[in-house]
UniProtKB/Swiss-Prot annotation, chains A, B:
Top-level taxonomy: Bacteria, Pseudomonadati, Pseudomonadota, Gammaproteobacteria, Enterobacterales
Protein name: Thiamine-monophosphate kinase
Species annotation: Buchnera aphidicola subsp. Schizaphis graminum (strain Sg)
Residues engaged in binding Mg(2+) 5: 215
Chain residues that bind ATP: 121-122, 146, 214
Binding site for Mg(2+) 1: 46-47, 122
């Protein structure tokens, strides 16, 4: 069955959630109306996912809904913001009720998991693409910014890098693995990245700068360095790479995935040495799992990759949507 | 020349405007960070414009930039909100510098006119489409909502209806007119609608309910009636239609444009009789130009169109993106 845009909203996207007390108007008026609690900043991030660029043509509506929200949540995580509201603009070739049912079920599942309320949006017909704007609150003034890294800071990464790219490579049949269990694990890492929300909130009072790894470590760390006017020395031997990758792939392959492929949605952050104790407490309490991969230097030193105590030459290339 | 996404942002969309004092972070971090002034509500609206649906394939980048912002501003106008910030997600087949230069010039022109600051966004490659999220402030608590119309309220329309649809019909070569000057005037009405921002702000303390005419009077007034649980009697003889339309087109044609075609972006609002004096003051001060077209009744009476004192039968059909 096909629906028009008003039917799509009322059938699949309206009244699925309780209003929160700061949401004066949600879906169904010319705009949403919200109230920002005192002493809070509002973090706003927006991301478009286009078929064939950010997701494969054969992605299921369930996986698409999860990933589009997770990717946007990751931007809030990198600011240390608490997720609150979201708007969804969806453009799709036809209003297929089976597709919409599956999409909206998965969409509200992740929204409810992260206590996000849908407050508005738009539905259109056209080639499949999704734009989400996501809103988070930051109590006080300590947001995690890209531009606050300081010379001498230590650089850390949450989790592991490269598994998402391995999963994508398997999905695209560029890589093959006999072990179905491992295949499925890596594909899941690509399709269901976990936004590091609680880590980001915990890091607000520990880290100086942060970014999420969406375009690849080299490219994303590059943003921190550019905005902070710093350089960095990275020890390649310490890059967190899972045993699954080191056991099943060649070093060139997984290092390239870890450095140049994106979509891990781990956080890369810098902390001053005086905050190491605080970080260790958070690690001990299992709020955060992270690895030190190097340190911030001065801008004129640039970004250096060191492997087995030797500087190595690398090709700096993150994910670029226009190549 | 072609650019990658970071070059597009830094060359065409960054540092074109002064930061306002409530904008802690704009473009260039994982999210924007804003501070909402005390006693203000934040209005948020989002709209996607897709090639071939909301704009014709041969639209110029200049017209596209203007219209996408104007359409979003119109949603804020219908809430009585003061425009403040905007985010832009643009998907385009290639990063053509001539196109981008023209688009961004026109984009910042309308932004500056309405004191809107660009605080973030996203660029992608794919079939041309634009998603804007727009943010406005409402001092106090009096937003113009769709659901506040009361039985006995008078119904008004700002400006005239139908000219945008006439312009579209000319652009699509469904209609022909010999007079080039009139043709260009009507096409301009379609391409450059004026969002009724100052009218919306003035109406916050006068009107009960409001909506902007994006999908057609019948459809949009229908939203007020549905949300307010009311009916309405509309006198077709009073629908504001310009002399240009009545002189150059048949009555069936222009009435259909006025009732069923959208994109006039005028405001339809209801006021209680006790506020007529206040409205007349605003009309006298030239803050608002509007026409009374009928009144609100009870829900069981439904929506009735009256022409020459007779009820007429009409086909209720606004613009539906999925038909």
């Amino acid at each position: 069955m096909e629906y028009n845009e008003f039917e799509i909203i009322s059938k699949f996207f309206k009244n699925h959630q309780k209003k929160d007390k700061n949401q004066i108007k949600g879906i169904g008026d010319d705009s949403a109306l919200i109230k920002i609690p005192k002493n809070n900043l509002l973090a706003i991030s927006t991301d478009t996912l286009v078929e064939g660029k950010h997701f494969l043509k054969n992605i299921t509506p369930k996986d698409l809904a999860y990933k589009s929200v997770a990717v946007n949540l990751s931007d809030l995580a990198a600011m240390g913001a608490k997720p609150t509201w979201i708007t969804l603009s969806i453009t799709m070739p036809k209003s297929d009720s089976v597709w919409l049912k599956s999409f909206s079920k998965s969409f509200f599942k992740i929204l409810n998991k992260y206590k996000l309320n849908l407050i508005g949006g738009d539905t259109n017909s056209g080639p499949l693409s999704i734009t989400l704007s996501i809103y988070g609150l930051i109590e006080g003034k300590n947001a995690l910014l890209r531009g606050n890294a300081k010379n001498g800071d230590l650089i850390y990464i949450t989790g592991n890098l490269g598994e998402s790219a391995a999963g994508l490579s398997l999905l695209q049949k560029k890589t093959f693995l006999k072990n179905v269990k491992i295949c499925n694990y890596l594909i899941k890492k690509h399709l269901k990245p976990i936004p590091r929300i609680s880590e980001g909130i915990a890091l607000r009072n520990i880290a100086n700068a942060a970014i999420d790894i969406s375009d690849g470590l080299i490219s994303d760390l590059g943003h921190i360095l550019k905005n902070s006017k710093c350089g960095a020395d990275i020890n390649l031997n310490t890059i967190p790479i899972s045993k699954i990758l080191t056991d099943n792939f060649k070093i060139d392959e997984y290092l390239n995935w870890a450095l140049n492929s994106g979509e891990d949605y781990e956080l890369c952050f810098t902390i001053s040495k005086k905050n190491i104790k605080k970080l260790n407490v958070a690690i001990k309490k299992k709020i955060i799992k992270c690895t030190c991969i190097g340190y911030i230097t001065s801008a004129e030193k640039g970004l250096n990759l060191i492997q087995n105590q030797k500087k190595i030459i690398f090709k700096k290339s993150g994910f670029n949507h226009f190549i």
